[in-house]
Amino acid sequence: MSNNQTLFERAQRTIPGGVNSPVRAFRSVGGTPRFVARAQGAYFWDADGKRYIDYIGSWGPMIVGHVHPDVLAAVQRVLADGFSFGAPTEAEIEIAEEICKLVPSIEQVRMVSSGTEATMSALRLARGFTGRSRIVKFEGCYHGHADSLLVKAGSGLLTFGNPTSAGVPADVAKHTTVLEYNNVAALEEAFAAFGGEIAAVIVEPVAGNMNLVRGTPEFLNALRALTAKHGAVLIFDEVMCGFRVALGGAQQHYGITPDLTCLGKVIGGGMPAAAFGGRGDIMSHLAPLGDVYQAGTLSGNPVAVAAGLATLRLIQAPGFHDALADKTRRLADGLAAEARAAGVPFSADAIGGMFGLYFTEQVPASFADVTKSDIERFNRFFHLMLDAGVYFAPSAYEAGFVSSAHDDATLDATLDAARRAFAALRA
C-alpha cells in the first residue's frame, strides 16, 4: 500500500470523506488523492516522494509559484512580531491601498479570510444598501458555500454529483434566482419581470468552477446596463480570476466597472485571505459606519497580509501578465494540437493565467455546454497524466492555473506526456 493510500485511510477515520474540501477526494475521477509533502516553484512532491507538475496551484493563489523567495521572506519577517492581534495594523492599510490602486472600481475594501466570506458579506451589503432581498446568480458559477448561493451551485458540488445541498432552507433559497450564463435574453426577461426586487446580481466574469467559461462582452455589458437601470448592485466575483486574467482583473480585461468586487486567492499569496470592496457610498453602509454588520477575528491577519502584499508587488513587474498569458495559451493550444493529431475530440481555452480542458469539439459558453463533455474520457486522461507526473484538476468541472514558475521545460514535459496520453485514449 502506498503512503498516499495509508494517509487517505487514516484521514477518513477523523475527517469526513478524508478531506477538508470535497474536490480533493478524487470522487469524480476515482483513485487515491495525492497527499502533498512539499512544493517548490511549479512542482509538488507527494507522500510517496513522486514529483508532479502542478496545474492547480492551491486552486489559483500560487500565481508566482510555490514558496517564492520574496513571499517566504515577507512571511518570515512578520512571524517574529506575532501571528494575530485582533487589532488594526499598518500592513492592513498597505494592502488596502494596493488593492484600491490595482482595481480602480474599488474605492474602499474590507479584508476577510475566505472567498465565501467575501461573497456572503457583499450580498448582505447589497441587500442592506438597496433594501431588497432577491439575488440573481448564474448556473455553473460558484460563489462559495453560503446558503443563499447553494442553489444549483457548481464546483465542489458537481464533483460528487449533487446539484443542491441538504441543510439549505427553502425559505432562504427562494430569494435566489438562477439564470443561464451568457444568456442575454434570459437576463432581460428576468429584469423585466422583477427588476425592482433585485438587490444584486453576482457573477464570475470569467467562470472557473464549471471549468473555464468566459463571460461574453455582450452578456457582461448587458449586466452592467440592466443593473444600473434598475438600481441593483452588480457584484463581480473575482475570487478566482482577479489578478489572473489581468493585473486589474477581468473588469480591466473587459472594460466594465462593477459596483462591488470580491477578491481572494492571489491576495493571500497562499494564506487564508480574501476581500470585498467597491463604491464608497455602498461600502459606507458597513459597520462600524453603517448598519450592515460584518466582522472577523482573523480578518487582516498579519501573516496572510504579508504574503498577499509580497505577491501583489511581484505581479506588478513589467510584462508579468503578458508572459503568464503566453505560457497559458501555449499550454492550451499545445494540448489541443496533440489531441487533434491523435484524433481525440477535445478543445481548450486560456485567458490570462487560467485555462480549460474540454472533451468536446467546441469550447463551452454555458454550464449546459460543459455537461456535454466526455467525462469518462476526461477521467482516463487525468489518470494518464497523473501517472506521468502532471497534476491537473481532479474534476472535469474545474479550471486549471499556470504560474510564473512554469517554464519551457515544464510546458514541454506536459505536452510530451499529453501526446502519449492522447495516443492511449485513441487506442
Curated annotation (Swiss-Prot):
- Look up the record and name the cofactor or cofactors this protein needs: pyridoxal 5'-phosphate
Could you say which enzyme class this protein belongs to? isomerase
Keyword field contains Magnesium: no
What InterPro entries is this protein classified in? 4pyrrol_synth_GluAld_NH2Trfase, Aminotrans_3, Aminotrans_3_PPA_site, PyrdxlP-dep_Trfase, PyrdxlP-dep_Trfase_major, PyrdxlP-dep_Trfase_small
Q: Name one GO cellular component term.
A: cytoplasm
Q: Which reaction does it catalyse?
A: (S)-4-amino-5-oxopentanoate = 5-aminolevulinate
The source's domain of life comes to Bacteria
Q: What is this protein called?
A: Glutamate-1-semialdehyde 2,1-aminomutase
Species of origin reads Burkholderia mallei (strain NCTC 10229)
